[in-house]
Amino acid sequence: MPPANRILTLSIVEGRYAIAKFPCDAEIPAWAAGATFFSVTRTREELSVVTAEASVPAKLDASRGWRMFKVHGPFSFDETGVVAALANPLARVRVGIFVISTFDTDYLLVQHDEIPVAVETLEHAGHKILQLELLNS
């Protein structure tokens, strides 16, 4: 079992991202899969696509301006507290997050204008942030 005060290493991922919503029966848009990073989730209620903001057509209603942290993994499926170790300090300073989990790790998205506060808060909580040179990209 991991410690309650888990310390994690994260990297800032270059670029800005957007989150688009489609009807649940929509086809996955071809433009989404062209980016280096993209995530698609289909539920009974919707199809959500997260991809590079530049890939999303301007006329499409989407939440734009997200920046991304990659949490250095991998993590086993029975590890607990990874997301909580990041979400809890950010919630205390009212920074909203969007989390994507993969087989090996997690990605944490925050709005571009909140990334300085997110970095400061996560570092204050003891986490290590790499690629700070991308902070203003």
Task: List each language-model region with its residue ranges.
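Regulatory modules associated with amino-acid/nitrogen control
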Residues: 1-93, 117-137
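A generic structural motif
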Residues: 46-51, 105-111
